[in-house]
Amino acid sequence: MAVPKRRVSKTRAAKRRTHYKIKLVKPVKDKDGTWKLPHHVNPTTGEYK
């Protein structure tokens, strides 16, 4: 079993964790001017984008 040779400092661990974040989904504007999430069907037009 792997055992760390040295203790990882709080700062070093926090720097590594800066990339563990949620990416925000940007809404897309449809042809009819309504905003919707990408990869979802527009209920009014039935368009999938």
From Swiss-Prot:
InterPro entries according to UniProt: Ribosomal_bL32, Ribosomal_bL32_bact, Ribosomal_zn-bd
Protein keywords: Ribonucleoprotein, Ribosomal protein
Family: Belongs to the bacterial ribosomal protein bL32 family.
Keyword Protein biosynthesis appears in the UniProt entry: no
PANTHER family: 50S RIBOSOMAL PROTEIN L32, LARGE RIBOSOMAL SUBUNIT PROTEIN BL32
A GO cellular component annotation in the UniProt record: large ribosomal subunit
The name this protein goes by in its record: Large ribosomal subunit protein bL32
Gene that encodes it: rpmF
GO MF term (any one): structural constituent of ribosome
GO process annotations (BP): translation
Keyword Phosphoprotein included in the entry's annotation: no
Pfam families xrefs: Ribosomal_L32p
HAMAP family (alphabetical): Ribosomal_bL32
